Design a protein with these regions (language model features):
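A detector for small-residue-rich transmembrane helices and their helix-helix packing motifs
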Residues: 1-256, 260
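Structured cytosolic domains appended to multi-pass membrane proteins
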Residues: 256-270
Length: 270
């Protein structure tokens, strides 16, 4: 039994942060599935899902995050995790893991806030009546829009066509607008919360501001067991190619991003 536990720990330690999130989402889904099978529709999952009632959210503030780990069907879970997996890998190639993880988590929180605010600010009857909010879609969409806003003019090839990322982002947002008037209007509202967060994060990050910096300490344990991040040791008056260390690092990182995206733009997705 001890060797089995060690084997599981070793395998988990090799996963990146997004693979761990996928594992966590899958475990929670299986737990909820079993609970519903045993207790039927009487299974109470309100302590994890996000209510549209402001008073309930105030009494269970953790649900602003935990709702992102609950999914109401296998298809719902599957598509969110597939998108998260591929975009998580793309983010890991372009940015440090802590940046992509902060975008994802803040996207979930922003989507949750948007959902609760909309149903408490707009008069009843404007939005369709919905139950509790579940799903990681807001976090996933925040990641997509972050990438599109951070590198808007980079072109990605789809079959025989090439599109700038900014147009792909606009198309995704426009495609979600009809959902605001559907039976799943609550979910679409959360999506737009993720869109806004992703866009705002990217525009600030382009200016050198990391709006998710306050999460660094909270998320530090994710990076300990995943691939180590680069450590920068500050030295006084050091220069690299006539530039300060920070300027040189920024320049080099941008060049790496350009090289990766040039490869993506040339090879494309077919």
């Amino acid at each position: 039994m001890t060797s089995l536990n060690q084997d599981i720990r070793e395998k988990l330690s090799r996963l990146n942060v997004f693979e761990k999130i996928i594992v966590a989402n899958t475990i929670v889904y299986l737990f909820c599935f079993i609970a519903l099978r045993i207790q039927g529709s009487g299974a109470n999952l309100e302590w994890l899902s996000l209510s549209k009632s402001a008073s309930e959210v105030l009494s269970k503030p953790w649900t602003l995050l935990t709702y992102g780990f609950i999914h109401n069907s296998f298809i719902h879970l599957f598509f969110n995790m597939v998108i998260l997996y591929f975009f998580g890998r793309s983010f890991s190639n372009l940015f440090k893991q802590d940046i992509s993880l902060k975008v994802y988590i803040l996207g979930i929180l922003s989507g949750g806030f948007a959902f609760v605010l909309a149903y408490n600010l707009f008069p009843s009857g404007i939005l369709n009546t919905v139950g509790a909010l579940v799903g990681a879609s807001a976090g996933v969409r925040a990641m997509i829009i972050f990438l599109c806003a951070y590198l808007p003019n980079k072109e990605v090839r789809f079959f025989t066509f090439q599109f700038p990322l900014k147009y792909i982002g606009i198309a995704i947002v426009l495609f979600d607008i009809p959902g605001l008037f559907s039976q799943n209007s609550g979910g679409s509202i959360a999506h737009f919360g993720g869109y806004l967060l992703g866009y705002f994060y990217a525009t600030q990050f382009n200016k050198g501001n990391d709006i998710g910096e306050f999460l660094n300490r909270i998320l530090s344990y994710f990076s300990r067991s995943s691939s180590p991040l680069k450590t920068v040791h500050k030295k006084k008056k050091n220069s690299f190619a006539g530039k300060k260390k920070e300027e040189f690092d920024t320049f080099t990182h941008q060049k790496q991003i350009d090289l990766i995206l040039d490869k993506i733009g040339k090879s494309g997705y077919e």
